[in-house]
Amino acid sequence: MNNLIKSKLELLPTSPGCYIHKDKNGTIIYVGKAKNLRNRVRSYFRGSHDTKTEALVSEIVDFEFIVTESNIEALLLEINLIKENKPKYNIMLKDDKSYPFIKITNERYPRLIITRQVKKDGGLYFGPYPDVGAANEIKRLLDRIFPFRKCTNPPSKVCFYYHIGQCMAHTICKKDEIYFKSMAQEVSDFLKGQDNKIIDELKGKMAAAAQTMEFERAAEYRDLIQAIGTLRTKQRVMAKDLQNRDVFGYYVDKGWMCVQVFFVRQGKLIERDVNLFPYFNDPDEDFLTYVGQFYQEKSHLVPNEVLIPQDIDEEAVKALVDSKILKPQRGEKKQLVNLAIKNARVSLEQKFNLLEKSVEKTQGAIENLGRLLQIPTPVRIESFDNSNIMGTSPVSAMVVFVNGKPSKKDYRKYKIKTVVGPDDYASMREVIRRRYGRVQREALTPPDLIVIDGGQGQVNIAKQVIQEELGLDIPIAGLQKNDKHQTHELLFGDPLEVVDLSRNSQEFFLLQRIQDEVHRFAITFHRQLRSKNSFSSQLDGIDGLGPKRKQNLMRHFKSLTKIKEASVDEIVEVGVPRAVAEAVQTKLNPQETEILLQVAEERVDYQTEGNHNKP
């Protein structure tokens, strides 16, 4: 805790409000709310905390606070601050998560469509549905029953669906607005589970078709009735009153919270939303923050009712959601909340069980690897791979695994500086020398094991640099691939020998992951560099096109291909002078330029020839 924080802690009021934690760069990393700012903020800097809170506190170098009139006002302010600043330690819902809805469009001749965007456009929306497959299944059924418009044909034509009774043919339709409203109401009733009327109508049509010997049409009506029955069985009825409601439940353990939301539509449970995240405040307060963020998402329509657990502040939720808020005491609504809580507990327990198994596997893998190689447990493993094509843009990459897991903040990329042509051995010598020369100079923590993606030659080069040049004592192993480019053999020892390693063991899978990751990282870096060099080289030598304009072109068009396809006017719009834009097109499209010149020359020749022939 620095002196600035110590001084500010003395100034904290006992009022409700929001506090804002910042890191060394002044970036907001956490926003919280409190009924008593003094007690809450001081608690971060006193006593011991769990690992995740320690990680947060270790980054705090400053904080600010905003006093509010009430706890509810603090809650609303907190949600807005989180939305605006997106702090990395706060609960952040996925922006791209949305559910499909079935929509009847607000048009003269309505259409039935599936959409993920809910707009105030006068359309009727039904849902959400668990996935687009479920929405499509229901829409296909509705299309067979209700003849909504499906085409955009000109006035003189009708579409195929008109001939099979699935389109009203707006080009010749004489129906009025009342007819369409009536049909929309029937769809609404159907989706609310009030489908007996439609089933009775279909049964009547089936009987009439059978009496007139139209057996194929009767079979179609029979299939429709069966499809409705199948749909009924897929949607579990959770409430007899057929209301739309969201049911919230949550469970906390070991510093983590799981929130489950059941979407009940027309009395049927159609989907659930699950989120697991670490919490830093009181669980009920972080739950309120979650609810506020949940209904800020455009894909979450506010239902008629929202059911919440008993220990949640009902008035606070009312301030967040414009809906009827209930804390049910008994009956089927209470059972729904209990079911949501139970599912939240199960989800959290599953997460911890999976984490424990994962830790056991990775910890066991590195311990077994250490025993196999007769070295201390390799907690930190650094792995290297080279990448080049015929010696062009040679690079090397290093990935780091700590306790069997990737530590991406420690990854490093290297442009090879001293090697000309395709020489893997010389490239490996350079990158090992650069990496561990720096480790030695700056007294960095050395790895417990170095893994080279390569065979005996590359490993021996690494050994020469590490042991003979730098005088370091770090175990070095090699991973050889087979002709299918798959992890095949582990090399270790002095002299190098193939280690007897079961291909079904956890340590083999760990080494395989390391080799795949370092190869991926090296290849990705090489492609980026090659693409950049290709882009630069093709635009080099154009007068008036410096690094800044090249950068602007790439930022605007995203690729060299798009620049080639762009017109001179489009390039000028990026801020490039017309003469330079023309030079860019000439350089990138030499064949097209030649053709244009030939056409121009032919036109001149033709005009000249015509002038000679004039009397």
Swiss-Prot record:
* Assembly description: Interacts with UvrB in an incision complex.
- Output a single Gene Ontology CC term carried by this record: cytoplasm
> Which PROSITE patterns does the protein's record reference?
GIY_YIG, UVR, UVRC
Q: Which residues form the signal peptide?
A: none
The protein's organism comes out as Streptococcus pneumoniae (strain CGSP14)
What biological-process GO terms show up in the record? nucleotide-excision repair; SOS response
The protein's matches in CDD domains, at most eight in alphabetical order, are given as: GIY-YIG_UvrC_Cho (cd10434)
Query: What name goes with this protein?
Result: UvrABC system protein C
Pfam families, from UniProt? GIY-YIG, HHH_5, UVR, UvrC_RNaseH, UvrC_RNaseH_dom
| Gene name in the database record | uvrC
In the record, the note on similarity to other proteins reads: Belongs to the UvrC family.
**Lineage, broadest ranks:** Bacteria, Bacillati, Bacillota, Bacilli, Lactobacillales
Gene Ontology MF terms in the entry: DNA binding; excinuclease ABC activity
